């Protein structure tokens, strides 16, 4: 009797893990394709800005630093693509690629001037990519690393780029505290929504499994 009662839940659990394994791999492929397209689009925008004004802020060392990060990021995306098309997808790979994305975003934001750059919005794009791998732990990792990356940018801006003495004595260069708090809270809320996507996907798979077992029982 106990085995009969436990069978639907056990089958649903197996169905979820099997579906997640396949769909997480497919999701990683989609994320990597979007990653490559996004790198090309953002770097293309940078090159257009550079062509319009060669002596502007987009030139010089800024251009060299951005190009170095883009080459490293694109190279990593190429390696990831080769691994995925060969169906090599170890469990830790999704965490490695997420941390890589957050690191590259943090570097680009630091090069662009710290937490005031609009590229901070890329953290939210990275968080929303996590549900495609169907892992709650990855959603938590993405949210946490985005917040850490933003805090690192704040520290870099205050203590290195501007200098703490100038920062705290000059209101014009400060990042408003309300902006800092709202950005971090928005990251947390984005992570919560991303987590709900994964939970709903699991409920859907388990419900289908239960319905299939019920239909088999009726037959």
Tell what function each PLM region has.
Residues 70-72, 99-104, 118-126, 181-185:
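Membrane-embedded alpha-helical segments of multi-pass membrane proteins
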Residues 21, 28, 212-219:
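Short regulatory/linker helices and ligand/cofactor-binding micro-motifs at input modules
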Residues 43-47, 78-79, 106-110, 128-129, ...:
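Alpha-helical transmembrane segments of multipass membrane proteins
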Residues 103-114, 121-141:
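Generic transmembrane alpha-helix motif of multi-pass integral membrane proteins
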Residues 13, 79-83, 181-216:
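Juxtamembrane or sensor-core-proximal signal-transducing alpha helices
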Residues 44-70, 87-94, 116, 133-199:
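Alpha-helical transmembrane segments and their interfaces in multipass membrane proteins
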Residues 29-36, 100, 122, 129, ...:
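Residue-level micro-sites within transmembrane alpha helices that shape
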Residues 1-93:
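N-terminal juxtamembrane segment and adjoining first transmembrane helix
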